[in-house]
């Protein structure tokens, strides 16, 4: 895991960030480690300037190309689920770099993140942001996220920031034994889902957790 370098980075007031953390606590996020990551990560840097004043609202916000920056609750919840189920994951695959905000949270929590994004301009911006924050433990790929990144697998954990209609088998096969997948699943009605690969019997245990709303996991790439 890498630590953020915040020298020269404008931070909003501690009070504003504390209010966000209080809202996350009220919504059921309990991991102190995850709450500290959210509190100390400058979310406004992951938005265009016109929307940066809304960065610490618990809301999803547009980042262009029909994509969104997930609301802080969802980022915190998915990170909490991933870390809780995987224990101490070293190698994590992220499907959908997007703005880089979830990537940034993961990179502070695990040894290395591999992040796949189908929209190149979004990933290029995310790379710049994370480099500016001193995070060097992320490897990026411009590709169709539905295929994962088999050359780099297996992974201790996989997190998807976009929703397929059904869980891609390719992602399941890239889980290490006892690895976990945290993914929203569905079209009109989506459910946040946790899949654990049972290392002894090599079977997949699926838990449906809560209703969510994500952008769909689309195929192909955009330059």
Swiss-Prot record:
Cellular component terms (Gene Ontology): cytoplasm
SUPFAM superfamilies: S-adenosyl-L-methionine-dependent methyltransferases
Database matches in InterPro entries: PCMT, SAM-dependent_MTases_sf
Gene3D superfamilies per UniProt: Vaccinia Virus protein VP39 (3.40.50.150)
Pfam families: PCMT
Keyword Nucleotide-binding (UniProt): no
Record-annotated membrane-spanning stretches: none
Catalytically driven reaction(s): [protein]-L-isoaspartate + S-adenosyl-L-methionine = [protein]-L-isoaspartate alpha-methyl ester + S-adenosyl-L-homocysteine
Documented EC number(s): 2.1.1.77
Catalytic residues identified in the record: 70
Location in the cell: Cytoplasm
GO MF term list: protein-L-isoaspartate (D-aspartate) O-methyltransferase activity
Keywords from the UniProt entry: Cytoplasm, Methyltransferase, S-adenosyl-L-methionine, Transferase
Major localization listed first in the record, in broad terms: cytoplasm
Gene Ontology biological process terms in this record: methylation; protein modification process; protein repair
Function text: Catalyzes the methyl esterification of L-isoaspartyl residues in peptides and proteins that result from spontaneous decomposition of normal L-aspartyl and L-asparaginyl residues. It plays a role in the repair and/or degradation of damaged proteins.
Family statement: Belongs to the methyltransferase superfamily. L-isoaspartyl/D-aspartyl protein methyltransferase family.
Annotated protein name in UniProt: Protein-L-isoaspartate O-methyltransferase
